[in-house]
Amino acid sequence: MNHCELEEVTQHINNKISMIKRLLELRAVAKDPDKRGTLLKIGQEVSAINELLDRFEKYVGKQRDLLKHLKDLEGFFQEDEQDAYHLKNNTPPHMPKRGQQAAPQGGGQVAVQSRQTDAPAAPQEQGPPRKTQRNQIKEMEFITVPEFDSIPPYMKGRVTYDQLNAAVQSINTAVTSKYKILHQPVKTLNNVSRSLQQRFKDQETKDTKGHFFVVEQDIKEFAQLKVDKRFVGMLNMLRHCQRLKEVRGGGLTRFILL
């Protein structure tokens, strides 16, 4: 037995001796009738303190569980916050902004107000007011994420989801610009617009009757977009997603909206 172990044994024996002395003193006090009541009162208070300590221990355990639950909630909130920042910084450009009306589903019909002449309005006494003619222009619906994922990789290449929907927006711009001119009365058009309107009519065939379509020249002029090999690939993807079909004839390829 080394020196440290001997000191520990000595200290333990001394503690036991001190405890025995204290018990003997308390035993002598307990035999005194005057002090026995005080000892009983102290024992009751010690029991009450033990019960209170038990309650505190249970309360601390509940608070510990609550703290763990709050930390878990904090982790969930942090994940939601990160997701919100990700959505804010990666919102597709074709998504409508606050205060803008989203593009309608089921064919994407957009009302276009026909241009009125600068002639002064006739007085109400001369007859009922003339009704304003409204024409509906079809717009291509944007590609959804599941549709984009369904495109074969060999067809998709490096084109991203946002780039494909940007092409959809460009085609819609060309379609809207074309049919705004096409729906105007001839007398309200200038020479340039009149020539364009005649060109649009000459490009129509029996296959395009009742459909909205554009040609490559329309996309170049109205969308200010270069129809290169990459854009042609995106047209193939839109055809795969059943957004358009091609009709050839007369040296032109007509892209008909479905």
Swiss-Prot record:
<comment type="similarity">
    <text>Belongs to the SKA1 family.</text>
</comment>
<comment type="subunit">
    <text>Component of the SKA complex, composed of ska1, ska2 and ska3.</text>
</comment>
<dbReference type="GO" id="GO:0000278">
    <property type="term" value="P:mitotic cell cycle"/>
</dbReference>
<keyword id="KW-0175">Coiled coil</keyword>
<keyword id="KW-0498">Mitosis</keyword>
<dbReference type="GO" id="GO:0000940">
    <property type="term" value="C:outer kinetochore"/>
</dbReference>
<keyword id="KW-0158">Chromosome</keyword>
<feature type="coiled-coil region">
    <location>
        <begin position="5"/>
        <end position="25"/>
    </location>
</feature>
<dbReference type="InterPro" id="IPR042031">
    <property type="entry name" value="SKA1_MBD_sf"/>
</dbReference>
<dbReference type="GO" id="GO:0031110">
    <property type="term" value="P:regulation of microtubule polymerization or depolymerization"/>
</dbReference>
<keyword id="KW-0131">Cell cycle</keyword>
<keyword id="KW-0137">Centromere</keyword>
<dbReference type="GO" id="GO:0000070">
    <property type="term" value="P:mitotic sister chromatid segregation"/>
</dbReference>
<dbReference type="GO" id="GO:0051301">
    <property type="term" value="P:cell division"/>
</dbReference>
<comment type="function">
    <text>Component of the SKA complex, a microtubule plus end-binding complex of the outer kinetochore that stabilizes spindle microtubule-kinetochore attachments, promotes alignment of chromosomes at the mitotic spindle equator (chromosome congression) and assists suppression of the spindle assembly checkpoint. Kinetochores, consisting of a centromere-associated inner segment and a microtubule-contacting outer segment, play a crucial role in chromosome segregation by mediating the physical connection between centromeric DNA and spindle microtubules.</text>
</comment>
<dbReference type="GO" id="GO:0005737">
    <property type="term" value="C:cytoplasm"/>
</dbReference>
<keyword id="KW-0963">Cytoplasm</keyword>
<keyword id="KW-0493">Microtubule</keyword>
<feature type="region of interest" description="Disordered">
    <location>
        <begin position="86"/>
        <end position="136"/>
    </location>
</feature>
<dbReference type="GO" id="GO:0072686">
    <property type="term" value="C:mitotic spindle"/>
</dbReference>
<keyword id="KW-0995">Kinetochore</keyword>
<dbReference type="GO" id="GO:0051315">
    <property type="term" value="P:attachment of mitotic spindle microtubules to kinetochore"/>
</dbReference>
<dbReference type="GO" id="GO:0072687">
    <property type="term" value="C:meiotic spindle"/>
</dbReference>
<protein>
    <recommendedName>
        <fullName>SKA complex subunit 1</fullName>
    </recommendedName>
</protein>
<dbReference type="GO" id="GO:0008017">
    <property type="term" value="F:microtubule binding"/>
</dbReference>
<dbReference type="InterPro" id="IPR009829">
    <property type="entry name" value="SKA1"/>
</dbReference>
<dbReference type="GO" id="GO:0007080">
    <property type="term" value="P:mitotic metaphase chromosome alignment"/>
</dbReference>
<dbReference type="Pfam" id="PF07160">
    <property type="entry name" value="SKA1"/>
</dbReference>
<dbReference type="GO" id="GO:0007059">
    <property type="term" value="P:chromosome segregation"/>
</dbReference>
<keyword id="KW-0132">Cell division</keyword>
<feature type="region of interest" description="Microtubule binding">
    <location>
        <begin position="137"/>
        <end position="258"/>
    </location>
</feature>
<keyword id="KW-0206">Cytoskeleton</keyword>
<dbReference type="GO" id="GO:0005876">
    <property type="term" value="C:spindle microtubule"/>
</dbReference>
